[in-house]
Amino acid sequence: MNLFSCQPVQPGDAPALQYLYASSPRYFQTIAAPIPLLEDVTRELESALSDPRRQLEFVVVSGERIGYLDLKFDYPQTGDVTVNLLLIAETQQRRGLGALVMRDLERRLSGRVRKILAGVFFENSGAAAFWEGLGYHFAVDARPVLSWYAKELGMQPARETAQLEAAQLETVQLEAAQLETPQLETAR
């Protein structure tokens, strides 16, 4: 069984995050940016971890960090959460893991946030299709650089939220159990 978990990124995790970035060169080609150097990632983490609205998580499968989730709460408005980045290592893509991570995030945030937003850089039809496949709709046109997709979660009473979370968690766990994810070598 290959269940994933999301684990908080710590200040000393810059080398692991930089390794994950380096294992995803197509993403950086798509956004026309070089793969960040370790010193750039170190500064990025220092800045993000000092912002109380940011939440950074590694996506972990079988003890290996194979993805990264960068969130900003109450942005652009109170009650919103923006996915700054959902990155799954290229060797782990096209297996449904990104969708599982987002379903799990939606479950965790259900009843606590109004909506989730995600930006798609440039004309990235694959990313747009990913978000649309998860029920996100085109929300804001900031082209040529960025298009925003959004999904309303809605606030719910605590009792209904707990029941929904239990049902959604069971679904996510069943889907995760069906994944066959080979190991990704990580820098130590």
Residue ranges and their predicted role:
Residues 161-186:
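Long, intrinsically disordered low-complexity tandem-repeat segments
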Residues 109-120:
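Conserved GNAT acetyl-CoA-binding A-motif
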Residues 96:
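Glycine-rich phosphate-binding loop
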Residues 99, 149-154:
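Accessory recognition modules or surfaces
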Residues 155-160:
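Short, charged/polar, Gly/Pro-enriched secondary-structure boundary elements
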